[in-house]
């Protein structure tokens, strides 16, 4: 049981569809979150939303995917919180967004992945921006990720 004053409710949907030459995967998530900070007369309530939508196509062993995620903001004062998340897996690998900025976070990601020489490769590009640019913050940068995973003498090797 956590005592973090967060109430989060959401829905998620994923699907797959196969064509003659292309396999499709798609999905979406939506959540709403309320947070209460402080107590008594000094208590402040914040509300933020979360949205994620993706579409992926696999053809000839290569998967191309576009993913759009919004960790919303409450007027630049509070960003949608994910205190129980697997943090390094999402929003890029440089760990710049382990905590959602108060302005929120929009992550537009394009990725390609496939197999090569007995291993798996992944190339991903992230474009980050603020959900609420009311504090003069809008462009939060971009990131390029490249990964190759293979087995060497029964041990996994990731570069």
Where are these regions (language model features)?
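A C-terminal functional module that forms or caps the active site or interfaces directly
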Residues: 120-157
């Amino acid at each position: 049981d956590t005592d973090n004053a967060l109430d989060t409710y959401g829905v998620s949907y994923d699907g797959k569809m196969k064509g003659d030459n292309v396999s499709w995967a798609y999905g979406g998530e939506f959540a709403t979150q309320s947070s209460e900070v402080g107590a008594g007369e000094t208590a402040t309530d914040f509300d933020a939303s979360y949205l994620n939508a993706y579409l992926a196509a696999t053809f000839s062993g290569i998967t191309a995917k576009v993913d759009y995620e919004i960790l919303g903001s409450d007027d630049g004062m509070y960003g949608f919180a994910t205190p129980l998340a697997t943090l390094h897996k999402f929003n890029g690998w440089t760990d710049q967004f382990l905590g959602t900025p108060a302005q929120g976070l929009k992550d537009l990601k394009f990725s390609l992945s496939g197999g090569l020489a007995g291993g798996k490769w992944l190339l991903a590009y992230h474009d980050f921006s603020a959900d609420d640019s009311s504090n003069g913050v809008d462009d939060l940068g971009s990131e390029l990720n490249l990964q190759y995973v293979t087995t060497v003498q029964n041990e996994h090797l990731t570069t």
